[in-house]
Amino acid sequence: MKITVLGAGSWGTTLAMLLANKGHEVRLWAHRPEFARALEADRENKRYLKGVLFPDNLRVVENLHDAVETAEMIVTAVPSHALRETAAAFAHLPLDGKIIVNVAKGIEQHTGKRMSEVLLEALPRIAPEQIAVLYGPSHAEEVARQQPTTVVACSVSEATARRVQEAFHTSSFRVYVNTDLIGVEIAGSVKNVIAIAAGISDGLGFGDNAKAAIITRGLAEISRLSSKLGADPLTLSGLSGIGDLVVTCLSQHSRNRYVGEQIGKGRKLDEVIGEMSMVAEGVLTSKAVVKLAERLGVEMPISQAVYEMLYENKPAPQAILELMERDPKPEHY
C-alpha cells in the first residue's frame, strides 16, 4: 500500500518507519523543507529519534501535494493545533477512496471540536467513513525500538477501522478495532490534561496515593464528558481510555506529565514550554476542555484546576488544597 505520513516529529517518524518495515511504500512529509532534506540525507531523525535508521522504502519528501496525491492512506501526525491548516492545504486534491488516519490527540481550542470533526470541515469532499484515528498507550521511543505496544484503530466504519488495523498491525504493534469515535477521541485528548495534573503531583513531592486519586478521578471526568457527548462507557475501559491515561500519567516519556512536574516545582509555563523541542498537547487541550465542559454543564474539577494553574498562575499547592476541600460527594454522580 502507498502510505503518506504528514508530520516528521517523533510519532510521525516512528509510524513511517513501522509502516515501511511492514513493506508499505511510505513517504514522510516534513513541514520545513530544510528539515525534510536533512532527514533524507541522514536517513534518520537525529532530532527526535537519534540512532534509529530509516528503512530503504521510506522516502522523505518536501512536496505536500505529490505526497498526498499518490497515497492510498494518509496519516496525519502534525500537532492538533496545526491539523486544520495542514488538511486545508490539500483539500483541493482528489481524495476519493483514500483513508485519512489521524494520530494527533487534542481538541481544537477555538471550536471545541474533535480531530475527526476538524478533518471533515477542512476536507469537505470526504465522507465520515474515510476518517479513522489510531490512539492508545504508545510512546514513540518504545515503538521505534519495536517494544510491545497495543493501540486501537477507530472509525465510524468498521471496514475502515479494519483496513487501518491491517496496515499497521505487526508482531510488536498490536492493533484492535473500535467504532466509538467520540469515546476514543475524547479519552485520548483529555488524558493529556489529567497527565499534567499527575505531573504537578510529582512536582509537589506527593506520593502514590495522590497519583492514584488523580488517575481515578480524572477518568471519572473523562467519563462524564464523553457520556454527555454520546460515547460508549465501555470505551473508557479500553486502550484509548484507561490504557492511555495510565501510561501518560506515569511514563518518563510523557511530555504532559513533565510539564506538570515542572509547574509543580514552581516554574512558569512559558519557561517550561520554551525549552521543549516537542509539543505537550495537554497545555492547549486544557483550554478547550474547560470551555467544552462549561458549555455542556459537565463538572471537571481536575481539568479546571490544571487550567487555572497553567493560565491564571494559581499556585499549585492552593489548587490541590481547593480540590481536596470541595464538598463531599458520592463516588459516582
Curated annotation (Swiss-Prot):
Family the entry assigns: Belongs to the NAD-dependent glycerol-3-phosphate dehydrogenase family.
UniProt-annotated binding residues for sn-glycerol 3-phosphate: K105, G136, S138, K191, D244, S254, R255, N256
Enzymatic reactions: sn-glycerol 3-phosphate + NAD(+) = dihydroxyacetone phosphate + NADH + H(+); sn-glycerol 3-phosphate + NADP(+) = dihydroxyacetone phosphate + NADPH + H(+)
Key words, A-Z: Cytoplasm, Lipid biosynthesis, Lipid metabolism, NAD, NADP, Nucleotide-binding, Oxidoreductase, Phospholipid biosynthesis, Phospholipid metabolism
Keyword Ribosomal protein recorded: no
The protein, known as: Glycerol-3-phosphate dehydrogenase [NAD(P)+]
Active site, renumbered: K191
Protein task: Catalyzes the reduction of the glycolytic intermediate dihydroxyacetone phosphate (DHAP) to sn-glycerol 3-phosphate (G3P), the key precursor for phospholipid synthesis.
Pathway: Membrane lipid metabolism; glycerophospholipid metabolism
Enzyme Commission code(s) on record: 1.1.1.94
Location of this chain's protein in the cell: Cytoplasm
A GO molecular function held by the record: NAD binding
Top-rank EC class of the record's enzyme: oxidoreductase
Xref: InterPro entries: 6-PGluconate_DH-like_C_sf (IPR008927), 6PGD_dom2 (IPR013328), G3P_DH_NAD-dep (IPR006168), G3P_DH_NAD-dep_C (IPR006109), G3P_DH_NAD-dep_N (IPR011128), NAD(P)-bd_dom_sf (IPR036291)
Origin superkingdom: Bacteria
One GO term describing the cellular component: cytosol
Residues that hold NADPH according to the record: S10, W11, H31, R32, K105, A140, R255, V279, E281
Species per Swiss-Prot/TrEMBL record: Chlorobaculum tepidum (strain ATCC 49652 / DSM 12025 / NBRC 103806 / TLS) (Chlorobium tepidum)
Entry's transmembrane regions: none
GO biological process, one term: glycerophospholipid metabolic process
UniProt keyword annotation of Transmembrane helix present: no
